[in-house]
Amino acid sequence: MINTIYKSALITGAGNGIGYETLKRFLKEKIKVYALDKNIKKLKILQKQFKFNIIELDLADTNKLYRELSKLKIDILFANAGIGRGAEGILYASRDDIEISTKINMESCLHTLKAIVPKMVKNRKGHVILMGSLAGLYPQISTVYGGQKGAIHRIAQSLRLELSGSRVKVTEICPGRTKTNFAKAAFTDKTKAKKFMSGFTLLEAKDITDAVMFALSTRWRSNISTIEISGTEQSPGGVPIYPVKDPILS
């Protein structure tokens, strides 16, 4: 159960996957929700069952981001939006992949924080939840995506320090591989996408939502800083070894 001091929330990337699952859970808890996404098709359908606000917005449009979000006064920010473009690594990512994914995964997060957090501090109440990743905590073969999520990890840590004493909490959720549409966008090769999402039992969106709800259930004196959640069959880290096929013998 969400701490009763929180009455309203903004969820970015609410139209699918983890954001959508969390939206439904918030609505069941009677939280006033602003659901933001570029694609609002599923949100429109859900709006026939529940009362909530939809913000149709591409987070790459920074000017519109500030125009829309500066109007809001909320208690919970779930900065969940992200894309997988470029996740195949620096050797395969295009220039556009790098630019667009950096804008969405990293820059828009900072702009969203700037638009929302000062009002939380002024109101002396709030909880910021940032969507990180195991790829941001452990080196993996994903220089682009891993680097961006590594930046989110540092942003979360620094924000927590910056907001000390403000009564605004900061939590970073770091999931492992989760059954969402991530791989479809991350890999141009369908075979690679299928391989990435197979071989073990994946997390599901509801598992990540459980972690979000846990962080939001704590008393004011308790701040869950980082939640690292992986599938039971997934062990992050490790030491992969790839022998060189044509070593230089000198």
Predicted regions and their residues:
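A short, exposed helix-loop element centered on a Lys and neighboring polar residues
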Residues: 113-114, 157
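Active-site-adjacent segment of SDR/Rossmann-fold oxidoreductases
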Residues: 158-168
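C-terminal helical subdomain
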Residues: 172-173, 191-238, 242
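Conserved mid-core segment of classical short-chain dehydrogenase/reductases
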Residues: 84-99, 144
